[in-house]
Amino acid sequence: MSTLRLLISDSYDPWFNLAVEECIFRQMPATQRVLFLWRNADTVVIGRAQNPWKECNTRRMEEDNVRLARRSSGGGAVFHDLGNTCFTFMAGKPEYDKTISTSIVLNALNALGVSAEASGRNDLVVKTAEGDRKVSGSAYRETKDRGFHHGTLLLNADLSRLANYLNPDKKKLAAKGITSVRSRVTNLTELLPGITHEQVCEAITKAFFAHYGERVEAEIISPDKTPDLPNFAEIFARQSSWEWNFGQAPAFSHLLDERFSWGGVELHFDVEKGHITRAQVFTDSLNPAPLEALAGRLQGCLYRADMLQQECEALLVDFPDQEKELRELSTWIAGAVR
């Protein structure tokens, strides 16, 4: 029986692909070496310990239907579109060695005619007239008996959108969590015009087989049917949930302030696991009672625009004369936390 396994995903769904990756990683025999090739449509992928509100322009992502996906490895935030090729190498210990998987990717690039080299802890760079440019970033995860190395290759990514979604709004977030390091990047199409995802996958596959001296048939993972993988439905449900992608953010505080025609308002939220643990309201409004009531209602509320709006509008029953103020407040808060 071969010790190699090759999987290729036809899905562009980041939650689907990360769930497949997690399933394979959990159930693979310790003697197996796995290569999984995939790509995602418009997605910001954040590291396990990151705060999406700090790392991303979550409002613009929502407007443009860009998904958020939290991965199980560490590292920083990256934007994926179909101009990226994603790879995952998995192996049991002691065979797991990220220098081997890095060399396989470098060999694949070399076979395509690109001379790249490893830089720092997790990047691959090429030399250009403007200096070194990053074409690949990686992240890693290890457990007691196995590990994986996954990363992306920039083929023809829309680099203008990197700045759109990875530069967060200037929110007043006093947040813990790992801050992404921005790097100067370039696409492989600058060096190899017309290079395709299929060509890159083929080159990585050949380099993978060459390193281990054996070949296997590819297993195609299709979004059209549920993969025959242990606990896939459960893992996909978690991977696609708000509780995992947003709610796992490290604790942080968010300070909002705005001046309305009826008075100034300052809101201070403390947020843990995606829930507001403390809400304070300060105002010079002549009628502060609705705002004081709102602070009480927001305690324990999910830090999500629709939930905050719901709590604001629930106050209309008790404060019908302040409908205009409460609706203005509701719209403002929802916009500020998106």
Curated annotation (Swiss-Prot):
InterPro entries named among the record's database cross-references: aa-tRNA-synth_II/BPL/LPL, BPL_LPL_catalytic, Lipoate_ligase_A, Lipoate_protein_ligase_C, LipoylTrfase_LipoateP_Ligase
EC nos: 6.3.1.20
Catalytic activity: L-lysyl-[lipoyl-carrier protein] + (R)-lipoate + ATP = N(6)-[(R)-lipoyl]-L-lysyl-[lipoyl-carrier protein] + AMP + diphosphate + H(+)
Keyword Cytoplasm in annotation: yes
Pfam entry (one): LplA-B_cat
Binding residue positions for ATP: 71, 76-79, 134
Binding sites annotated in the UniProt record for (R)-lipoate: 134
Predominant cellular place of this UniProt entry's protein: cytoplasm
Keywords, ordered alphabetically: ATP-binding, Cytoplasm, Ligase, Nucleotide-binding
Localization per record: Cytoplasm
Record pathway: Protein modification; protein lipoylation via exogenous pathway; protein N(6)-(lipoyl)lysine from lipoate: step 1/2; Protein modification; protein lipoylation via exogenous pathway; protein N(6)-(lipoyl)lysine from lipoate: step 2/2
Enzyme class: ligase
GO MF annotation list: ATP binding; lipoate-protein ligase activity; lipoyltransferase activity
Source organism, top-level taxon: Bacteria
Annotated BPL/LPL catalytic domain residues: 29-216
A Gene Ontology biological process term: protein modification process
A single Gene Ontology CC term: cytosol
Keyword Nucleotidyltransferase: no
Miscellaneous comment as given in the Swiss-Prot or TrEMBL entry: In the transfer reaction, the free carboxyl group of lipoic acid is attached via an amide linkage to the epsilon-amino group of a specific lysine residue of lipoyl domains of lipoate-dependent enzymes.
Subunit and partners: Monomer.
HAMAP family: LplA (MF_01602)
NCBIfam families recorded: lipoyltrans (TIGR00545)
Protein task: Catalyzes both the ATP-dependent activation of exogenously supplied lipoate to lipoyl-AMP and the transfer of the activated lipoyl onto the lipoyl domains of lipoate-dependent enzymes.
Protein family per UniProt: Belongs to the LplA family.
Protein name, as recorded: Lipoate-protein ligase A
